[in-house]
Amino acid sequence: CKEAITGFLEQKKREYRKRGTLRSYRCSCTSFCLFLIDHGYDNFKLISPEIIKEFSIQDKHSTFKGRATRFVIVRAFLRYLDEYRYTERHGLDQCLISGSAPVDKIIDVLSDEQIQRIQEYRMTHNTPVELRDIAIVLLGVKTGLRACDILALRFQDIDWKKCQISIIMKKTKTQITLPMPVEVGNAIYSYLKYGRPDAESDFIFVRSKAPYGKMTGKVCTRALYRILPERNNVKGGGFHVTRRTFATNLLKNHAGIDEIMDALGHRDPTSVMKYLLLDDERSRKCGLSLSVTGLMLEGGL
């Protein structure tokens, strides 16, 4: 088990998975292997669909999310075992019983009224922390950058003459160059001139009090909450809503899937497809009348 788990985790490291994610992978794979050992298995080649199904039945989690997460990991591990010929049977990953049909969640985005309030906040607030807050939130809403990438912004990442931001995204290691809207540039400039402490740091956003330096944690989320307090009461209502809002607005402005992928730094189009649900205008064009399909509606209300 140790050799297989180590190889599997090394593969995930090469895919730039975070430490916390790797710990979850290790825990789930170890739990699966211990289950096999407890049931008398000392070789992956002996694994059968029946024992996989038994594992899925006995797995106990207090939440469906925890159970689903473990199954996603174990499925990936089973595919790894198949790929590297630890097992003799193919398709064992399909033997795990999910226990529930997939559900499409409603995408949470900022409303037009909330976007307007962000703009109004910018015009009426000018303390150092408020200037930092508005620059951070506008970067999220207008460029779609993740919180970790915003806090990692350095002076050399911004080309003021070309109005561009160029970074290597922390999550995907993708190099990306984005246009910097004028209002974003103005907000950053106002923060640098009137709000940022005179700190010897390469990072644009620094703490407002000594010791000055790069900020971490929930700084971006707290900035959003100070501007839109009601977001604090939204389940899962963190800073990532600004990225979803940015992607949705691109789609509403008739950007194509490839353009949105480039703007977000995504490699997989499936991660962008969920935003199509919010494009009411183009979704209506997909509808077909019953006459076109050859079906006739009889009777009435």
Q: Which stretches of residues belong to each language-model region?
A:
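N-terminal core-binding DNA-recognition domain of tyrosine recombinases/integrases
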Residues: 3-106, 122-125, 199
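DNA breakage-rejoining catalytic core of tyrosine-based enzymes
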Residues: 87-90, 101-117, 172-182, 197-202, ...
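Catalytic-site neighborhood detector that most strongly recognizes the C-terminal catalytic loop/helix
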Residues: 109, 169, 264, 268-289
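Basic, Lys/Arg- and aromatic-enriched nucleic-acid-binding interface segment
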Residues: 117-147
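Active-site/catalytic core of tyrosine-dependent DNA strand-transfer enzymes
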Residues: 182-234
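C-terminal secondary-structure termini that scaffold catalytic or DNA-interacting sites
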Residues: 291-301
